[in-house]
């Protein structure tokens, strides 16, 4: 399974993702420059965290116009796996690959800390190797992680089982206190209707090695590899 990790001007988590996929997961992985029209026959695409184009205008607002994102849209439309992490999630919403938007955190401050997220569905390639209801510890690092959408979109996400992760307590309770940024209904990650595109604010690549003190995030990448092996 070959992964492609996008690089935009201002990305800063691209090398982290590349390291985890190549050195920890032992998968073929390549960098894809933002001006590229070619995804180089990759089986899965990672839209990494950072500050693409300096977050000018809005987070992800300029990145959506880059040539590589046009290629990613076509790739996703054909069922290709795409995971957007933090700024990558913001880019996916701006690009129309996922509904809703990410606003400034409720407390108007940048937040960088470990959080707990509960697995809400295993009916997706990204979580097929996990258990519904289990809790993962994964760090966040964002200023605009407050997920919002209109009532109709929220109802659709629930009906179609597309809420993939929610912020929770260590024992899996969905509480106001467990929500770090004010995200509607504690949403930490969602997928598209085809279930092949995931956007999440927490950083699984920062929780993928013992040296980092957390390894739960690596299981998301393992699930992707396992799902592709079954195709």
From Swiss-Prot:
Signal peptide, first to last residue: none
GO cellular-component term (any): cytoplasm
Coiled coil location: none
Catalyzed chemical reaction(s): N(2)-formyl-N(1)-(5-phospho-beta-D-ribosyl)glycinamide + L-glutamine + ATP + H2O = 2-formamido-N(1)-(5-O-phospho-beta-D-ribosyl)acetamidine + L-glutamate + ADP + phosphate + H(+); L-glutamine + H2O = L-glutamate + NH4(+)
Annotated pathway: Purine metabolism; IMP biosynthesis via de novo pathway; 5-amino-1-(5-phospho-D-ribosyl)imidazole from N(2)-formyl-N(1)-(5-phospho-D-ribosyl)glycinamide: step 1/2
Gene: purQ
Enzyme Commission number(s) from the entry: 6.3.5.3, 3.5.1.2
Subcellular locations according to the entry: Cytoplasm
Upper lineage: Bacteria, Pseudomonadati, Acidobacteriota, Terriglobia, Terriglobales
Subunit structure: Part of the FGAM synthase complex composed of 1 PurL, 1 PurQ and 2 PurS subunits.
Residue positions of the active site: 86 (nucleophile), 203, 205
The protein, known as: Phosphoribosylformylglycinamidine synthase subunit PurQ
Glutamine amidotransferase type-1 domain residues: 3-231
One GO biological process term: 'de novo' IMP biosynthetic process
Major localisation: cytoplasm
Entry superkingdom: Bacteria
Protein keywords: ATP-binding, Cytoplasm, Glutamine amidotransferase, Hydrolase, Ligase, Nucleotide-binding, Purine biosynthesis
Function statement: Part of the phosphoribosylformylglycinamidine synthase complex involved in the purines biosynthetic pathway. Catalyzes the ATP-dependent conversion of formylglycinamide ribonucleotide (FGAR) and glutamine to yield formylglycinamidine ribonucleotide (FGAM) and glutamate. The FGAM synthase complex is composed of three subunits. PurQ produces an ammonia molecule by converting glutamine to glutamate. PurL transfers the ammonia molecule to FGAR to form FGAM in an ATP-dependent manner.
A single MF term (Gene Ontology): glutaminase activity
Record InterPro entries: Class_I_gatase-like, PRibForGlyAmidine_synth_PurQ
One Pfam family it belongs to: GATase_5
